[in-house]
Amino acid sequence: MCAEVYEVKMKKTYSIIFASLLLLFLAIPAMAQDNTFYDDGFSVTDNTFNPNRALDSLKTKHVKVPKGLYLWTIDDHFGDRTTAAPDTAQHLFMNSIFTTGRYGEYNTTGNLGAPRIARIATDRDYTSFGFTDVLSYFITPPTALRFTNALSPITNLSFNSCGDRTNGEDHLKALFAVNINREAGFGFKFDYAYGRGYYQNQSTALFDYTMWGSYIGQRYNAHVIFSFDHLKVTENGGITNDEYITHPEATSETYSENEIPVVLSSNWNRTNAFHATLAHRYNVGFYRKVPMTEQEIEARRFAIKAQKEKEAAEAAAEAEKMLAGATGNTGAPKQSKRLSGRPDDAMIVGDLNNDSLRTALKKAAEERRKLLMDSLMAKKDSVAIDTSWTKEEYVPVTSFIHNLQFDDNWHTYIAYQSPTNFYQNKYSVPVDFARRDSINDKTDYFNLRNTFAIGLLEGFNKYVPMGAKVFIAHNIANYRLAEDSLTRYSNNVENTFSVGGQLIKTLGNTLHYKVLGEVWLAGKQVGDVKIDGEGDIRVPILKDSVVLNLKAFYHLTTPAYFQRHYHSKHFWWDHDGLNKQMHTHVEGSLAYTKTRTSLRFAYDNFQNLVYLGVSYDRNNSVITGYTADIMQSSKNISLLTLAIQQDFTLGILNWENRITFQKCSDNNILPVPDFNFWTNLYLKFKIARVLAVHFGADMRYFKSYYAPEYVPQLSQFAVQQNDNVKTKIGNYPVIDVYANFLLKRCRFFVMMSHVNSGTGNYFFTPHYPLNQRVFRLGLSWTVFN
């Protein structure tokens, strides 16, 4: 026990020291800077940031970027920057609150922030088996965090709510970001989701605190991320009988929504997750004069205009002062002063007539003002003639890159009671892990990855059309698993070493691409290979352009650690003999803005696919023999995906559609619905020219299939194995009616979700029904101040 306490204390101490060092990396260069004139914040050439590279127009057509606000994300290998759009769009704001996704593309257990899995199988991650994977609605991965650079501090408050204190949902987000100077900025985000649940034993309480900082200097760049998540999900195992939803008239008793019997009670999943990222680089290069960006030219023109107006105002004020002195109209009586030594009756020789004096001084003042105005106009003309708009810029040629990522996770599954004969197996575990008949399955792990790279950057010379990087990476991971009552628990350490390279082209308007390769040379993952490539081509057609996006990868990977080893009271496996799984993916998408059409095609091929299977018996709503285990298919499995997006507008009427077709060669191993459909019909107009309104209804639908079932004890979705109790879901439309508003920087909505409830099979996961008809409201307010 002492050793265990000592280990926990040491881990906390290391985390504090680690966090302090990361903050120091950011603070030292930031404190060395002064507060100079602030422009767009991207005056330094960086081959990884391409402001000319357009985002998908169909995805960003509703986004209006505030002036002076720039956002970007970083990748997990090198910290390369990619422009990002701010989350300020009115369009589909009301759907951002759903765990099922904006377009209903996720299967979920039903509650706010509850476990979910992508129904479009090509979008899943098949290499991970973490306990937080199913909570992707709430957890923001480091590669999706938006860094900010703004002319003024940014504050955003978002809140949505439904129901009451017994069964409602509340979600609060608060974000703040500010720049210290033109190079350095930081921000933080607080996120709290509390879903009490409309069914028994279903509540979720999710907390996230994330802070970040960035420093973009001429030679040194750094990005820092810290995040901590505390996640608690109450597990009910689903309802005992689906007929309470599908055929309530066939049951012997009638239940309200919160009275429907569920399988489990007093069962919880609890996870604490800490993440830290430090991505920094030192650039070596030279200075040269380059054209300013449109934003910089606009800022420079604004500064020149302000200076001219100031000088003109000063000249006018000086001329008016001289004119007033000449005419004697000073606006206030002057106090007469008596000069000592001058006799009272003394006279000035040669006094001029007062009218002549006023005329002469007035003429002189007007001539002076005219000369000053002519001078200002000459400056204006010279500025207008100067169209070069150049600046001196530091151009990096070579970058020395270091990227550090640290994750520490603690996961516990707790059960105070379980149904009789519910589990098929029972294993011997440490006494402090499970007392008597209760369950206290503990698993924790940490992962530390260091990547060192040298990059030759594109853009410093016209004869170098691309950038290139080479890197080495080391990864150390420690997994803590339960053992028998004598050994108690074990720590399993895995070290891996890999090398790789990248070719990248982000500059220009026609062609962009990025190819990354990595090979593992030592450790448990020796022999693993990952090759990822993506690119886009812009082709002009009929005074418009078509954007063709291409993506492909080849992954030969060792199964994740928890797919190979897992120990708990009722689930236990050690699969050292699993083969490497091969995943090949080819994807292409085409977007034509003129017709508002988008097409997507994807092909996936799996060999030795590793997956989780679940099996049990069900008799008169009683479940027995519940078990789950890792399986590997020796088959060659193919998955074909075709998606179509088409939008229409007729006056104030808008109609948006997304259709996805999927076909898998073996639905017993990789089950997918053949058809997914989302449609949105709404009126778009303004009230009093200031209040933008979207009023309409949307619907999500998918064809019935044997969907993966949720296994709460493992926080994973699993393929249904027992043909006698296999359950289909789908073939049911879910319709929402909404009114979505935008008033300046304030977005708000009112909605009646699932207006057609009570009419059928409303499950998005087997045995986990969706909420019935619910009135919802939400608000998001952004302040730049």
Predicted feature locations:
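Low-complexity, intrinsically disordered/propeptide-like segments
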Residues: 4, 21-29, 326, 342, ...
